[in-house]
Amino acid sequence: MGIRLYKAYTPGTRNRSISDFKELKNNKPEKSLTSSYHKKQGRNNRGIITIRHRGGGHKKLYRQIDFERNKFNIPGQVKSIEYDPNRNTRISLIHYEDGEKRYILAPRGLNIGDKIISSEEADITIGNTLPLTKIPLGTAIHNIEIKPGKGGQLVRSAGTVAQLIAKEGLVATIRLPSGEVRTIGKNCLATIGQLGNVDSNNRSFGKAGSKRWLGKKPTVRGVVMNPVDHPHGGGEGRAPIGRKRPLTPWGRPALGKKSRKNHKYSDAFIIRRRK
C-alpha cells in the first residue's frame, strides 16, 4: 500500500499521485456479491437537490459488504483483497467453511490465506470480531456497532482506527479517530485492527477530471454568484462578501460555527466532543 507519483508529462500529471494497488490480487469482483444501483445524483424522492456537487461519475457495481459480521463460530479464510469503487478502503473476500462467501472491510495486515472468525471466544487477532466486553483495554478496533445487531457504523474509512479505553457496568468507552470519546453498550460488536489503505489521504488528484470520475462536481464560490443565489454574491467586479461573517447559501453562519443541533439524543453518550 503505497503512493505512485507521476512525472510532469502534462499539467494534469504534474501534481498527480494515486495508490499503487500492489496489495490487490483480483481484478474481478465476486459476481454473487455485486448488484447494480441507481445513482441519486444528490436528489431526493422529489428530484430536489439536497446534496450539492454530486453527479456523473464512472459506472459502478455495488459490493455487498458484511458490516454485521454475524456469522458466529464459523471460521473463514481470506481468498482475495480487492478494490471497491464505492469506498476508499479495500475489501476482502472471505470463504467460510460452510461454503458461504462474504465481503468484509480489509484491515491493515490481513493477508490472503489468513483465518478470521466472529465469536465471543475468538483470539485478539486482526480481522476477528468480538463483543466489546471480550476485548482487552487499549486494543485497536474498527467497524463498531452502536446498537447490537445493527451492524458496524463507526470507524469504516481507510486508515481509521479507534481505541477501547474503559469498561464499566453495561457500557464501554472508546476513543474515535476524530478525538471524540463516547460510550457504547458492551454487547456491541467490533473488529480487531486498523483499516488498511492508510495512504489514502496522501493522494493528489492532480486534475479536475479525476474528481469527476468519482462523481464529484465543482464547488463554486458564493462571492462569484449573483445576489439571488448566495448571500456573498453581487457587487461590482471583485467585491468582498459585504457581511460581518461568512454565511452558507441559506444564510446560516459558516466557517467555524458549530452545526450540531442542541439536545441531540447522543449527547448523553459523548464524554468529550471531537477536536
Swiss-Prot record:
Q: Which GO terms describe its molecular function?
A: rRNA binding; structural constituent of ribosome; transferase activity
GO BP: any one term:
mitochondrial translation
Q: Where is this region: Disordered?
A: 224-263
Q: Which InterPro entries match?
A: NA-bd_OB-fold, Rib_uL2_dom2, Ribosomal_uL2, Ribosomal_uL2_bac/org-type, Ribosomal_uL2_C, Ribosomal_uL2_CS, Ribosomal_uL2_dom3, Ribosomal_uL2_RNA-bd_dom
Output the Gene Ontology cellular-component terms: chloroplast; mitochondrial large ribosomal subunit
Q: Which cellular compartments is it found in?
A: Plastid, Chloroplast
UniProt keyword terms in alphabetical order: Chloroplast, Plastid, Ribonucleoprotein, Ribosomal protein
Name the principal localization, coarsely classed.
plastid
Pfam families (alphabetical):
Ribosomal_L2, Ribosomal_L2_C
Quaternary structure?
A: Part of the 50S ribosomal subunit.
Query: Which family, according to the similarity comment?
Result: Belongs to the universal ribosomal protein uL2 family.
Q: What is this protein called?
A: Large ribosomal subunit protein uL2c
Q: What is the name of the gene encoding this protein?
A: rpl2
